């Protein structure tokens, strides 16, 4: 029972078992889920960000349990890291804008954040690649996506600064 719950958690309710591009599907599901939470249910972005931080710490343990007997320490079916990484820029965007944007602007921004996160997660610029290559454990699995999410934040902040 515990192993089944852990499996559902680290695979984001089975999304990680999708044969092709499970990370992209997990990022897309996360983006849609967060849009629903923020713009349909009007959840507080601060509460969601705190929840993501809690999920980060739970994930360190859960992913470690999942990969402990595997040869591949970063299996494709583990996509909770995509959830965490994709949630960072979206949550910070929502905190910065306090829900003040029109729906079209929000959808465009979410799409851009999704694309940027996937690019940074796939090409792994430094230090994303550092965590991916040097930490063959749950910390490395998760931190490369956290850093990819922070890259998205950096790009968006740079864009906002340069466009004002």
Short names for language-model regions:
Residues 34-49, 90-109, 157-164:
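Helix-coil boundary and interhelical linker segments in multi-pass alpha-helical membrane proteins
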Residues 13-19, 31-32, 39-40, 87, ...:
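N-terminal membrane-targeting hydrophobic helices
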Residues 145-162:
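Final/C-terminal transmembrane alpha-helix of multipass membrane proteins
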Residues 1-26, 61-89, 118-150:
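Interhelical loop and helix-boundary elements at the membrane-water interface
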Residues 26-33, 58, 93, 97, ...:
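Intramembrane alpha-helical segments
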Residues 115-116, 155:
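Core hydrophobic alpha-helical membrane-spanning segments
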Residues 32-36, 49-61, 153-157:
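Hydrophobic core of alpha-helical transmembrane segments in multi-pass integral membrane proteins
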Residues 24-29, 46-53, 107, 111-115, ...:
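Hydrophobic alpha-helical transmembrane segments
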């Amino acid at each position: 029972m515990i192993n089944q719950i852990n499996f559902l958690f680290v695979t984001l309710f089975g999304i990680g078992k999708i044969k092709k591009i499970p990370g992209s599907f997990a990022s897309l599901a996360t983006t849609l889920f967060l849009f629903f939470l923020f713009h349909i249910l009007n959840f507080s972005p601060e509460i969601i960000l705190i929840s993501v931080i809690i999920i980060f710490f739970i994930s360190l343990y859960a992913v470690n349990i999942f990969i402990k007997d595997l040869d591949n320490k970063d299996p494709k079916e583990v996509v909770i890291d995509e959830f965490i990484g994709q949630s960072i820029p979206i949550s910070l965007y929502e905190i910065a804008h306090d829900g003040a944007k029109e729906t079209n602007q929000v959808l465009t921004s979410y799409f851009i954040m999704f694309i940027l996160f996937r690019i940074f997660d796939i090409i792994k610029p430094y230090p994303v690649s550092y965590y991916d290559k040097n930490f063959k454990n749950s910390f490395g699995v998760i931190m490369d996506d956290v850093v990819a999410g922070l890259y998205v934040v950096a790009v968006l902040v740079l864009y906002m600064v340069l466009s004002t």
